[in-house]
Structures are given as C-alpha cells and as structure tokens.
C-alpha cells in the first residue's frame, strides 16, 4: 500500500536497488559487504511495504573486485596506483573500472524512469551514480552528507585514497592535472559548484577548505547544524542548489553514513566524533522525501568488518537501512 510522501519525478513508484560492492576507493576491506548486509536486514521488503515496486540491479561482481584488490595488495609494484608528485592515486584503474560499471547501471535505471537507490561500497562509487543522474537531470542539485568534503584533487590528496576525491572528479577538477589516471578520464565532470551543498562536515583537509572557498560551494559543517538546527540547514542547502526556485527542483542525496556520529553508526571506515545524531540524520532524508523532489539516493561506507562488537554491526546496518527507508517515505506517524 502506498503511504507517506509523493515523489514528483517517480509517480509510478518504481525503484531499483543498485548494488555497488566496491572497496577500492580506500584501503579497508569489508565495506563491499554493505549491500549484502542491508539486503539481509530486510531492506528490499521494507521498501516494498512503503508502496514501491523494486528490483535488484547488480553493477559488478563483488568477488572479482575483491580478488583484484587482494592481488594488488600482494603486488610489489603497487598495481594500478599512479604516482603524482610523490603521492599515489591509489588503485586508480580499479576505481575507474568500478565507477564506470556503477555509472552504466544507474544510467539504465534512471533512463527507465526508476528511482536509483545505490548501496555501497565506499564513496568513490558516487563518481558513477552522480554522473548518471546528471545525464538524465542536468539541473539536479546534489546534497552530499558526510563528515568529509571528498573534494581533494589527485594533487591535493594527502592519502591517495580516491574515496576522498569523488567530488573533484565530478566537477572536472582533475582534467588538466598532469598524469590524471586514464581510467577516470571517462567521467564527464559536469557538476557545477553551484549545484552541490554539503551537510555534516567536520573533518576537512586544508586543501579542500581552499577549494570550497575558491569555488564558493555551499558547505554546512556541524557548526552550522549546531547554530541553526538541522531543519534550517536543510532548507538552506536546498535553496543553495536551486536558488531561482526557492529550493524547488530535482535533488540527489549522496549519503556517507559517517555523517552521523559514530556513537550511532560505529562500523564505518573513517569515523569522526561530533556528528549528526541519528534523529538528525533521519530527519534530513525525511525532509527531502517530504519535498517531493528527491530523485536518487546513495547510502555508502557501512563496513561490518570494522565492528568491535556484534551490536556495532546491527546498529550500523539498521541505521543505513533506516536512512534509505526514511528517504523513501517512512514516517513516524
């Protein structure tokens, strides 16, 4: 039975769960298990209970990529890493291959007028999801929920882990960089700095701060959440990406679960204390659902292998599923 908010762009309420079990954008295995765990938790059935018809859309062979990653770790040559001024763009070939597969899957979904719910995997997979959504909705705004800005270029990245760089690829900031990995030159790079807003930031590298300021990107840190409250921040973010229409227009949400405080979501790769409460994190997507303008959602960076106790797995996976359900119409009353 259909319940809750209406979706202006998906009145047929058809949805595809795109599985993106990729961990190569960072160095910790286990995050590729996120989609499997969320499905095991009953996510697909609970979405159907909200009135959506669903289908699964696998984007890649999980075992194949895990095998490639393990082979690369055993390699003495560094595998597909690219050296740039002494810093590695780590696993660049695998990131390029995986994100193109995700792009192909999400493109198929959105061109069929189905809502793409993409389950990661690390946040590098957003290179594929956002690029595909922008093909269909070039005026879409992007809300990036994260403790981190993920806008390092391959020149500024301190770690070389490409899950910290997807926004720079989406904006085309690496196109003129010497030695830009060939595997990622397929990325259109057409996201405008005026079409993205961040919520939840609290661990931003110095180079990223400069990029955010130089490009005038709307960035709401936890300071802003504390100062204004989560509802006001969401309203400001929506208006930032659609200023001409007072916040009305298609919006994609790419949600890294580390945006929420690790007290609530502990099993994630780069936890940072002082984040959103679980209720704030859920209210955020409830408000997006209420707007009627949500067109796509990523839920990424759930890593069950990093749990210290079983309850940490349960808390993390249940929270990831709750984010998806609330974005898709679940309400408290």
Swiss-Prot record:
Phosphothreonine occurs at 77, 270
Q: Share any extra remarks.
A: Present with 42800 molecules/cell in log phase SD medium.
Gene source species: Saccharomyces cerevisiae (strain ATCC 204508 / S288c)
- Give the source lineage, highest ranks first: Eukaryota, Fungi, Dikarya, Ascomycota, Saccharomycotina
Q: Which reaction does it catalyse?
A: L-arginine + H2O = urea + L-ornithine
What does the similarity note say? Answer: Belongs to the arginase family.
What residues does Mn(2+) 2 bind to? Answer: 146, 148, 256, 258
Binding annotation for substrate: 148-152, 159-161, 205, 270, 301
Q: How is the cofactor bound?
A: Binds 2 manganese ions per subunit.
Q: Name one GO cellular component term.
A: cytoplasm
Q: Which PROSITE patterns match?
A: ARGINASE_1, ARGINASE_2
Q: What is this protein called?
A: Arginase
Taxonomic superkingdom: Eukaryota
Q: Which residues carry this modification: Phosphoserine?
A: 16
What pathway annotation does it carry? Answer: Nitrogen metabolism; urea cycle; L-ornithine and urea from L-arginine: step 1/1
User: GO biological process: any one?
Assistant: arginine catabolic process to ornithine
Quote the EC number: 3.5.3.1
> Induced by what?
By arginine or homoarginine.
Positions bound to Mn(2+) 1:
123, 146, 150, 256
Look at the named UniProt entry and state the broad enzyme category this protein falls under. hydrolase
What cofactors does this protein use? Mn(2+)
Keywords attached to this Swiss-Prot or TrEMBL record, sorted alphabetically, are:
Acetylation, Arginine metabolism, Hydrolase, Manganese, Metal-binding, Phosphoprotein
Annotated GO molecular function terms are:
arginase activity; manganese ion binding; ornithine carbamoyltransferase inhibitor activity; zinc ion binding
